[in-house]
Amino acid sequence: MIGKSDVLTLRSGRKVLSSKAVEAPIPDDWGYFRNGTIHIIQSSHQDIAWMDTPEYCRTERIEDIIIPALDIMREDPNFTFEMEQTLNLMEFLEAHPERRDEVIERYKEGRFVWGATYNQPYEGLASGEQLVRQAYYGRKWIRENLPGCDDRTANNVDVPGRTMQMPQILAKSGIRNLFVSRMREGLYDWYSPDGSSVLTYTPGNYGWATLMWKFFEKDAVTAFERLHPRSRLWSDYFRSRHIPPHYAVLMSCDATKPVNFAPVIDEWNRIAELAEVELPRLKCSTAEEYLALVDTPEAQMEEVVGERPDLWLYIHGPAHYQQTVAKREAGVLLPAAELFTAVNNVCLDGSWDYPRAAFDRAWMASIYPDHGLGGKNGEITDRIFGDSLSVARDLGRSLLDASLRKIADRVPEQAGNWVVFNDLQWDRPPTAVSCPCSASSATAANAWPSWPRACLRSDMPPTG
C-alpha cells in the first residue's frame, strides 16, 4: 500500500506470463516534508456582494456559512475556520448578539478568526488614510470590542494588485501577515519603500484547491495520492530557504460552505502513525497559525519591494466614475475634518465633545465598497455603494465646515476679510482663493458681474 512504483512480474518457471507496472496507492517519498505537516486552511471568500445583492450575501454568509462553522466547532474541537474581514464579524454580532461570548471564546482559542482589516479593498483606489482606516475598523475594532481578542493577518485574496505603502501601513498597525492570491505561490517578505515589511503568503489562486485539485473530497488514500506531487514540487523551495516543513492548502472559493474534513484527517494520521516510512501529518489550521510556524529567524523568504499595479483596470475608471469621485473627495475631506475638529477642541480647552460616532460612520462609509462592484444584480449593489460613498463625502464636508466656522469665529479679523486654512503638514506656497465679486472693465460703461477675484496668502504654516 505504501511504497514506490514497481513492475509486477508473473512467472511460470523461467517463462514470464505477465508483467505490469504497479504504483503504490500511497507514495513513500515525501522529500523535505516527510516529517512535516500539511495544514488545511479553510475559509469562504466573501465579496460584500457580487454573488448577489449585499443583503442576500450578508444573510447567506451569516446563516449558511458562519453559523454552520460555529456549530461544527461545538462538536469537533480540532475544526478551524476563518472569514476574511472584520465587517463580516460586525454583521454577525449585529444579527446574533446572543452568540457574542461564543465568538470571543473561539477567537481566543484561535479556531475561528476574522481578519485584521475592515474588508478587502482596491488598495490603489483608496487614499492613504482610507487604507489606514482598514486597520482602524479591523484589528483596532477587534481589540476594543472583543476583550482578549486580536488579529494579525490581513486578507485580500481576490484583487490582483498591491499598493506600495500597504505593507508599511499593516506593519505599523501591528499586523504581521498578509494573505493574498492571484500571484505565484510562495512565501514572501513584502517591503514598502521605508523598509517595513509583512510576511506575505499566496496559494496561487484562492479557489484552485476547492475547484480543481479537490484533495480531500474522497478519502485519505486519495488525499495522499493527490498531495504527493505538491511535496515534490515544493521540497527544494522550502529546503533551500530554510523554511520549516509546513505546507498549506487553502480550501476556499466564493461563498463556499464549511466542510469538516475530520474523517480524511483522522484516517491520514492513522496511516502515518502505522507506516514504517516517514509521512507528513495532516491538520486543520488558520492562516495565522500556519504563518507563525514558518516565520522563523532562519527562514529566508523571497523579497518583494514596491507595488503590483491592479490588473482589473475596468473597475477604476469610467465604469464607476461617480463612485470613484465621491470616494476620493471623502478621502480628502475626512482627514481635514478630523484635523480641524481637533484644533477647535484645543482652542476650546477640550470643552467641545469630539464627534467620534459621526467620524466612525463617515470613515466606514468611505471604505465600505470593497472590490465587488457590479456582479449579479449589480445595479442594486452599485447604487448602495454609491450612496455609501456620497454619505461619506457629505458627512466629511459638514464636519469640516462645522469645525472651520467655529475656529474662524475666534479669529479677530475685520468684517469682510477671509480666513484661509491649511490642512497639510507642511508649509503651503502662495495660494489663490477665488471668490465671487463684481468688477468693471477699463471703461466704466462696461460692467462684468461675478468676476472672480484672486486672494493671495503666502507663508501659510502647516496645520494652520
Regions found by a protein language model. Give the residues of each.
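Catalytic-domain carbohydrate-binding cleft regions of carbohydrate-active enzymes
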Residues: 2-423, 443, 449-455, 459-463
